[in-house]
Amino acid sequence: MQRYVNFFDKNRRDVHGLLLLDKPTGFSSSFFLNKIKKLFYAKKVGYIGTLDPIATGMLPICFGKATKFASYLLNSDKRYRVLVKLGESTDTFDASGVIIRIADVQCNKEKIEECLKSFLGTSLQIPPMFSSLKYQGLPLYKYARRGVNIPRKSRTIHVYSLYCLNQLNSIIELEIHCSKGTYVRSIVNDIGEYLGCGAHIISLRRLMVGQYIASMMVNIKTIESIFFDKDLNDLEVLDKLDNLLISTETIMCSF
């Protein structure tokens, strides 16, 4: 089913607001940005805070005037739920990479809690090579795939909370509240080093960005169900889609 073909000819719509997309796993943030732009038939859109293909959860997408305030969200704290595999290290620090180390897991609950506490507060973190940070116009992960290591500057991060929700043998579930620019995959890798057994991320879910919480997210299937609803005409579809957006003014509420 194709919509808007006759309703719109050349120009896309002026759409303003914020969509908190619940990004599924398996695809890049850019993939879903382009998809949302087409579904909303919007002129100007942009997302805040890249989520890797393996990651899910809150991907803020700004429309129109909201893009002017994107930096406020980019600089906001984030909260994540992360599933970690102890005893295995990978070159990417997550399950998408190649296993480069296997070790026995010999740590109890007390040792893990001691480890997590050591990451609280302010520290310096070097961004991982497998990241979207750019060097001479190319993201670092492209250099990493070629086996090229690029020197990176450390950056200041702050971990407000980090605790273990569940543990089953070598699998632990963590929740972390951290500042902007924090690479959770690097923290997980460092946890593995601290425990002496290695570790990598199995799954990562972003639960919060700034003042926006998980219950405010919109599933991509919800958006598609509106778009493909045969009982709605084009104007009704656009109206229902626009109702999913959060007002631009809310971005400034906590600043």
UniProtKB/Swiss-Prot annotation:
Presence of keyword Kinase: no
Domain of life per record: Bacteria
Keywords annotated in UniProt: Isomerase, tRNA processing
Binding site for substrate: 80, 183, 204
Catalytic activity: uridine(55) in tRNA = pseudouridine(55) in tRNA
EC number: 5.4.99.25
Signal peptide stretch: none
One example GO MF annotation: tRNA pseudouridine(55) synthase activity
Keyword Aminoacyl-tRNA synthetase found: no
Function recorded in the entry: Responsible for synthesis of pseudouridine from uracil-55 in the psi GC loop of transfer RNAs.
Protein name per Swiss-Prot or TrEMBL: tRNA pseudouridine synthase B
Gene source species: Blochmanniella floridana
Lineage, uppermost ranks: Bacteria, Pseudomonadati, Pseudomonadota, Gammaproteobacteria, Enterobacterales
